[in-house]
Regions:
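A generic alpha-to-beta junction signature in SAM-dependent methyltransferases
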Residues: 81-82, 146, 238
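Substrate-binding groove/exosite segments of carbohydrate-active enzymes
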Residues: 3-121, 125-128, 136, 247-267
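Non-catalytic carbohydrate-binding regions of carbohydrate-active enzymes
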Residues: 32, 42-45, 86, 92-95, ...
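Extended, well-ordered alpha-helical scaffold segments
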Residues: 16-24, 66-79, 124-143, 199, ...
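A generic short-segment signal for beta-strand/edge and adjacent turn/coil regions
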Residues: 26-28, 168-170, 178-179, 227-237
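Flexible, active-site-adjacent loop/turn segments at secondary-structure boundaries
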Residues: 8, 15, 49, 85, ...
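Short linear sequence elements within intrinsically disordered, low-complexity coil regions
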Residues: 15, 52, 132, 162-165, ...
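The feature captures the catalytic groove of carbohydrate-active enzymes
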Residues: 89-109, 140-225, 249-262
Length: 267
């Protein structure tokens, strides 16, 4: 597998700043945890899992200091992808056992950071192929499962799908949701979601870039066209030209013109 000779050196004539950086690096290393024999960087601050929302990105950033640990923050999600293509929204260690959790998506800051590791790790072709396989399978899963009403727009089914903990716009939607069909009898969900559409777009855009790297012009054009199809649907279905913004649509296809208290204030 990939190996990289990475490291970071910080120099300053300011002794206070030098000590501050040293202590910050020491604190960060406390967030390196053992997941079944593999070191990973957890979020910290009491968050002891790795979430798809943040930690592939966090790992890619940390890889310049510790490549093996940073790489594992992406590899763990790739290794624990289900046979149907779904990627766990989080991975935990429970009673000493690594447990992938499929009860939410929890964002999708994964494709681009994972591709960054390809370059940082010396352009390993096997890793690139594994990443492509992961993204293609997840994109296929999304379109097979998350367009329950067939309107061509992918859906969020619970608050944790988009990382919007306690979001009022979700109304009575569940926090996590483990089933492969949408919850029934809820006020808003399934919601046609710009977030979940962006998950597909990110997969397809990155797959086009992987095809370019691999010298496959035909596949590059195909994935680029598929990415544009997602983008076009988002614009045609979710964009509000008068307001200059996108808005999700609820289960009845009504535009969700939700604003937070902060957005209504004069701040």
């Amino acid at each position: 597998m990939m190996q990289a000779n990475t490291g970071v050196r910080f120099e300053t004539k300011d002794p206070l700043l030098s000590q501050l950086v040293k202590q910050a690096e020491e604190k960060c290393r406390l967030n390196i945890k053992n997941f079944g024999g593999d070191p990973v960087l957890v979020e910290g601050g009491g968050y002891e899992k790795i979430w798809l929302e943040t930690q592939p990105m966090g790992g890619a950033m940390y890889a310049s200091r510790d490549f093996a640990t940073g790489l594992n923050n992406s590899l763990m999600f790739m290794r624990h992808q289900r046979a149907d293509g779904r990627i766990p929204g989080s991975i935990a260690v429970i009673d000493g056992k690594v447990v992938p959790q499929f009860n939410k998506f929890q964002g999708f800051c994964f494709p681009e950071p994972a591709l960054d590791l390809y370059y940082l790790g010396g352009k390993d072709a096997e890793y690139l192929a594994q990443l492509a396989k992961t993204l293609e399978a997840f994109d296929a899963y999304l379109w097979r499962v998350r367009d329950s009403d067939g309107d061509g727009c992918l859906e969020t089914w619970c608050k944790y799908d988009t990382g919007e903990d306690h979001a009022m716009r979700y109304a009575d939607a569940p926090d996590p949701w483990e089933e492969e069909t949408p919850p029934q009898g809820c006020t808003a969900v399934p919601i046609a979601s710009m977030d979940v559409m962006s998950y597909s777009y990110a997969c397809r855009e990155t797959l086009a870039e992987i095809a370019r790297i691999s010298g496959d012009a035909e596949a590059q054009a195909q994935w680029a066209a598929k990415a544009k199809a997602v983008q076009d649907k988002m614009v045609s279905y979710l964009w509000d030209d008068a307001r200059g913004a996108m808005f999700d649509r609820d289960k009845n296809h009504n535009q969700m013109l939700w604003r937070s208290a902060l957005s209504r204030s004069t701040c």
